[in-house]
Amino acid sequence: MAKHLFTSESVSEGHPDKIADQISDAVLDAILEQDPKARVACETYVKTGMVLVGGEITTSAWVDIEEITRNTVREIGYVHSDMGFDANSCAVLSAIGKQSPDINQGVDRADPLEQGAGDQGLMFGYATNETDVLMPAPITYAHRLVQRQAEVRKNGSLPWLRPDAKSQVTFQYDDGKIVGIDAVVLSTQHSEDIDQKSLQEAVMEEIIKPVLPTEWLNASTKFFINPTGRFVIGGPMGDCGLTGRKIIVDTYGGMARHGGGAFSGKDPSKVDRSAAYAARYVAKNIVAAGLADRCEIQVSYAIGVAEPTSIMVETFGTEKLPTEQLTLLVREFFDLRPYGLIQMLDLLHPIYKETAAYGHFGREHFPWEKTDKAAVLRDAAGLK
C-alpha cells in the first residue's frame, strides 16, 4: 500500500445532533432503570428554544420526559440565553406513542433464546491494532480533542468556551502504518469577549497539544482553529439537531463500513444497536487475540428471526489463519442471536446516555469493549 491520508471528525456533547442523541439515551436509561424489558425507540429534535421528543415506547415505567430533557441540556452546559439555548426556559414537547403490536409479536417469544430481531438490517463491527484501544487513530484523536474542549470548558480553564465544537484530524499512513498527522481542524463556539488570536493560542496550548502525541506532529502539520474567524452563534440556535445524524462519528470515523442504523434512543432489542455492539466485541477480541491486525465483522438479521441471516469476517489480508476458520470460531464462541448477545454483553442496564457523545467504541468500561474471549480464541486457533 502506498502513502495515503485518512481523515475522521468528531463533535462535542454540545453539538445539536449530539444534544438530541443524549436526550434520547437519557430517556432510554430512565426507562430501563425501572423496566429492563421496555421497548424504546426515542427520537429527539432540537432547535432554538425548543426540544421535541417523539417515538414509540412500550413500558410499565413512568418517567418525566421534561425533567430528563432539561437535566440533560443543563449537564451539557446550555444554561443561559447568551449561549443560544437555555435548559431552564426552552419548550419541551412530547409526542410518544406505543410500539406496533405487529412488530412486538415478531420479537417476544415464550423461550427467550428464540427472541426475534426487532427489525431486518445489517451491522458492522471493526477493530485495528493501530491504537491501544484497538480503534482507528483518526476517530480516536478526533474524539479526544472535543472531550478535552469540554473538560477545559467545564473546569473553568477557558471560561469563554461554549458547548458546541467540532474536530477533524487527518493522519498520514505509509504502507498501512501511521507516520504522522497532516492536518488538524478544531472549531469551538465561544463568547463575544475573546479575540481570534487569543482563542487560537489558548486552543493550541490547552486543547490540541495535551491531546495529540508529539511524535506524530511535525513542521508541516497544518492547524485550522476556528478558520471562519467567528463562532458565537452555535448549538441549536445555529443548526437544528436530530437523533441519529452522527452515525460515523459514533462508530469508526469512516474507517469501517456502516449498516446505516443509528444507535441512540433504541433499547437492546433493536439489533441496529445491540448487534453493532456485538460485532465490535467480536472484531476486538479477534484482534486482541492476535488472529488479525484489522478485522471487520458484518452480521445481518430478518425481523422476528433469532439466528443471524449472515456472518462475514473481513481481515484485509492481515489474518493469521484463513477467514473461513475465523468465521467458524465466531459462530462457536459468540452467540449473536438477539437474546444471546443481550446476555453476553449484559445490555439491559441504564448505560446508554454516556455512549451518546465521544463515540460508542474505544472506551474500555463499556461491556462490548472487553477482550475476555481473546485467550480462548487464540487457544482454539492453535496459535502459541
UniProtKB/Swiss-Prot annotation:
PROSITE patterns xrefs: ADOMET_SYNTHASE_1, ADOMET_SYNTHASE_2
Entry-linked InterPro entries: ADOMET_SYNTHASE_CS, S-AdoMet_synt_C, S-AdoMet_synt_central, S-AdoMet_synt_N, S-AdoMet_synthetase, S-AdoMet_synthetase_sfam
Record: residues binding L-methionine: E56, Q99, D239, K270
A Pfam cross-reference name: S-AdoMet_synt_C
Single GO cellular component term: cytoplasm
Chain sites annotated for binding Mg(2+): D17
Record-level Gene Ontology MF annotations: ATP binding; magnesium ion binding; methionine adenosyltransferase activity
Cofactor requirements of the protein: Mg(2+); K(+)
Protein's UniProt name: S-adenosylmethionine synthase
Gene that encodes it: metK
